[in-house]
Every structure is written in structure tokens, then in C-alpha cells.
Amino acid sequence: MDASAVRKRAAELPAEPGVYQFEAGESVLYVGKAVDLRERVRSYVAPRSDRIRRMVEAAAAVDFAVTDTETQALLLEANLIKRHQPRYNVRLKDDKSYPLVQLTAHEAPRIEITRTPDEAATVFGPYTDKSRVETVVKALRETYELRGCSDHKYEGRDRPCLDYELGLCSAPCTGEIDTDAYAEDVESARRFFDGETGVLAEPLRREMETAAASQAFERAASLRDRLEAVETFHEGGSEAVSGRGGRRLDVLGVAVEGESATVARLRSEDGKLVERDRHRVDAPADAESVPSVLAAFIPQFYAERSLPDVLLLSERYDDEELDQWLHAEGVDIRVPGAGRAATLVELALKNARRTTAEADGPTALARRLGIDRPERIEGFDVSHAGGKDAVGSNVVFVDGSPETADYRRRSLDDENDDYANMRRLVRWRATRAVEGRDDRPTPDLLLIDGGDGQLGAAQDALAETGWDVPAIALAKADELVVTSDGVADWDDGPALRLLQRVRDEAHRFAVQYHQQVRDAVSTPLDSVPGVGPELRERLLKRFGTVDGVRSASREELERVDGVGEDTAAAIDAAL
């Protein structure tokens, strides 16, 4: 992406907290958090370091997800970095994890703060403020006398330890409290971490008032500080992006606009919000359409996917057969009104609404061209060097966003004729579609990278094959839109920006493939001592192109199998 592309994308983002991702095709290059997404992404117009400059140049798109608070953004950022391992997230990718609280899977569960929870434990968090977590856990132990000792120390005791004398443990190890009573205390701790602040705040408040009445002012002040930590523990914390582990949870939020709708899905695995996706669907004509959208979306989406354990919805659908199916599959359906679950649903709704707003590009484009809303647009571009190593790209955008799984590319005849190459590329796509050899849906619009000549070549190919799909072109130099009716200079707006994104992505994808084809024949790596054909292939696979290898640090080179210090130094010197 160049400075202009970054500036345009930043203008499309909300001025809200959230997480952003720089992406190149299916690869996530960088994940970052922001108090203000728009301003943060705008700062990448002029990167401060060479490393970030290279990242921006390699990126093709910027995706985002809004959150309610900066803390939620911080934790979602950490989860996404751990999941995607982006190349340019050096500091955070290797950073330590955030503290968790676990109740162990023991007959008398232990409560403790940890960064590496036991597999079978009940886990809460992560949390960003460790000191506050320590205060809360200490308060829980004093109030409910939950044990904190290791299982090794617990086993075989014949008398209580010092924690019992200090009022920090009820000594289940020696039977000072029976199993049922201890289980009730553990359940109180669970309820607190599930959002019921009162189960801990009320006992602390009573104790504070008693201390103040007895003029034990230091004790009362200490309890006041502890009470404040407890009462603010769930404010803007991590529970929106992480919760009790062990189950898969999907959250669906729906935003309806006219006759179409966006369904945003958030996925939580093992208690952490790790992924989100968005889908456009046709909405029923009735005004109360959210339940109808859900009733249509759920069976279609999950027909070929594994169902979650819990499904959180923004509204309840009215479909008895769907209810019976989900119940038979063991799915717990909830429409939460408060707490962590409600916060997750609100996040899904926010992302659905943002996607609906972002999808205005296809609607604006339909108005400008006088066609039906082009939900699916395919972009085409050709890249070569003086007619050598000619390649073509075919990218796909659905509702204004890249559909990278549907990207295609192919080598073309080595001919220094842009029009002939474009004709071959579009004919290849059209022929496969007409003959039923391309399983991708028929697009609503084709966008050709170029001017009147390239568009004419593409239209010739469409006429030859009988593939009835409208096509337009976008010229690079003056950003002129070329149609069958002539050339137009559109004002900057959602329609033009969408065409620019498709055109730029087709160009990027073509250039990237051209470099790979060129590098597959002969590269500067061939003359580097210690780099044979297999190692060259691994390097190109890891870094994409020779330019990618050239921009890599020695440390990054040494992470490739077969590259030691000497070889990394030789590569660095040669390139």
C-alpha cells in the first residue's frame, strides 16, 4: 500500500477503540491496537522505521474490529498475535502472556494466579492489571477461605497449616470444613468472576463498616481500598475478549440495511476471543427482519461447519425446527441481557454495523453505473517485464472486502502486448465459467486495470465466449473510469474508492506473482555460497520474493531451516 491507499483506508475507519490488521492476501503481516482506529492507521502514511515502511508496502489491505475499551483492544490484539504470529509483530509476538486466575480441578479446588493454567482447570481472564488481580484473589481467600497451597502440600496433612490460623483457608485437607460447604465457597468465587461483584463486595462493605464503627480506622481504610478494587474489577476489563475456558462459543450480531443484512460472528475458543468474520445475506422485506435473518443464516452457515457449544444471539429467532435441531446437537442458545455475554453480543453488533457502513461502496457503484448492486466484483491485471514472464491476476471482492480464497493467477504467453495479454486472461476466466470448470460464483461486475484499450480487449473476450458479465476499467494515471459509454472523472467517494481498492489489489497480486515466476527461473540467490535449489525454494516460500529475502534481518533468515549464521551473513552481503 502506498501513502495514498493508507490515507484513504484510514478515512473509512471509525474513530473508536479497536484492533487493526495489515494483510497481504491470506497472510496477516501486523496486528495493532488503537484508542482511535482512524488516527492510528493514518499514522502509517509516514512510517517512522524502515521495518514498518516495508510492512506497509507489502500490505494489500487493512481489516479492523471495534471494541468497547482500550483494554479489550489490548487483549484482543494479544490473542490475535498469538493466533496468527504476524511477521512484523516482533515485540508482542514474543511478549509474556497476561495473568489468569484458575480454580483447579480438585475435590477441594485451589485458587491461584497463573500464566500457564492447568488443562482441566476453570480459568478466568486474562487481566492486564496484575496488582488488582492479586488484591481480588486475596480478598476472595480471606472472605471465603479458599486454599492456595499446592496439591503436594495438601495431601497427607494431619493438622492445618498457617493459612488456617491466618483466616486464609478453611482447611478442607483435615476436614475442618466439609466438602459441600467448601464447594459453596468455591461457587461464590466462580460467581464473582462471572460478573456478580456483590458476592465479594457486600461482605467487604459490611466488614469495613464494622471496622469503622469500632474505630479501627487503618483496617477500615485498607478494606475501603480493597472494596474499590473489587467494585471496579469488571469495568472495561478482559471479560469481553476472554472468559471461562473449555468451550467453543460463537456470537452473532445482525445489522439490517434495506434488503440486505450483515451478520458478524465472533468466535471464542478456550475462553479467548480469537477470530471474527462477517457475511452479507439477503434480508426479508418485513421490518422485524433480524430474527428472520438469524433463522436463515444459522442453518446455512453451520450446515458444513462444526457447531459451537454456546450460541449467543442479539435477538431470539422464531423457528421451531431450527430450535429442535440445535437442541439435538447440544447447542446452548442464549440471548443475554447483561454481563460478559451481553458485552460480546454488543461487540458483534458493532462490527456488523461497521461492515454495513463499509459496504456502501457497492451500493454507490450501482447508482453510478445504473446496474444491480454488484456484491461480487472481480478485478484483472497483467504484469510482465518487456514481454517476459507475463502473468495475469484475478482477484475477488465481496461486499467491498477481499475474498482471498477465490483469488486466481496464471502465466501468459510472453508477448509485449498488454491488450492481447488482457484478452487471454479474461478469455481464460470466461471460458472456464461457461464450460462449468470454475466453481466460483458468477461475478456482478468485472474491473479491468487499464484504459479503453484494455477494456476493449476484455469485452472482445467476453463476446467470443458468450459470458454475459458487465465490465468496466479504471485507468491508473488520472483515476478515470472507463465504461462502454465513454470515460468519466468520478468524484472521490465510496464508489471510486471501491474500484481503486479492487484495481490496486489486482495489481499487487499480479506483480507479486510476476516476481515469483521471475525468481523461479533465476535469482541473485543462485550465486550465494551455501544456498542450493532446496534452500532457495524455502527462502522464497518464507519471504515471498527476492525483495522479501533482501529486506529480512539476519535473525529472520536464521529461522529458516538450513540457514545458519554464516549463510545468513552471505545472503545479507550478496543482496
From Swiss-Prot:
Chief location of this protein within or outside the cell: cytoplasm
Taxonomic superkingdom: Archaea
GO cellular component: cytoplasm; excinuclease repair complex
GO BP annotation list: nucleotide-excision repair; SOS response
Occurrences of domain GIY-YIG (ranges): 15-90
Keywords of the record: Cytoplasm, DNA damage, DNA excision, DNA repair, Excision nuclease, SOS response
Matching SMART domains: GIYc (SM00465), HhH1 (SM00278)
Family membership: Belongs to the UvrC family.
Protein name: UvrABC system protein C
